Amino acid sequence: MTPPRRRGNSLDGRTWTRYSISVWSDIRKSKEELALKHPALFPAQLVERLIECFLPPEGNIVLDPFCGLGSTVVAAHSLDRVGIGLDINPEYVEVARRRLGPCSDGCRIVCADAGAVSDHVEPETVDLAITSPPYWDVLTRRRSADRKAIRNYGDDGKDLGRVSDYQQFLAALGAVFGKVQRALRPRAYCIVVVMDLRKGKVFHPFHSDLAAVMQEVGYLWDDTIVWDRRHEYNNFRPLGYPAVFRINKAHEYVLIFQKPARDSATSAR
């Protein structure tokens, strides 16, 4: 007898097809999320969809090592899954815990830097990781192109958003995601939401640079989704005008990585 085919998720065929389109333009923040005014909050709706797509039916634990205001944990809880989040900023942790509420059903939000994942999560117990790491130190610098004010995640010395050297920043992320990989079960996905960056005259293709680091750590780069955020912006400015034409970035990359199976020739280091 042929064994039943393993299901990757619980979606029906119609929803599977709709979600498989490579550009997602229908994700919206809730009124509650808009009111939080976090510098880089991604909506629970995005996380819910990613869980629906990449968490197998038997999967239960979802990890976010840079949980910010807790969207990943809140979304996991809303889908009757267990979310675990870490964040270095105690103010954000407090808000995230309020969002989660007292009936957390095993979900937890820890005030710790992302590098402490191994202290709070056992090896090979996580079924899916979803996160958005800091945008380097870009938010701590005044932007000449659009003159937006400085925005800061915090002043902890372990905050990766304060690392000024780009290569050191990428290396630090690689160390974190190496620990995340050890926490993941074989073949589990790690999904990272990022935007490309510009510091002064230098453009940094953050999504591809991070993807290279992730592959060095041992992940398989499985695919990419473009998250179209144009509807969130109603105050675009002519960046660089009139001297240098600059691009208004209104999209982010949803990078889809997978931990190899144990018997893979490219298994994690």
What function would you assign to each model-found segment?
Residues 1-269:
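Class I S-adenosyl-L-methionine-dependent methyltransferase catalytic core
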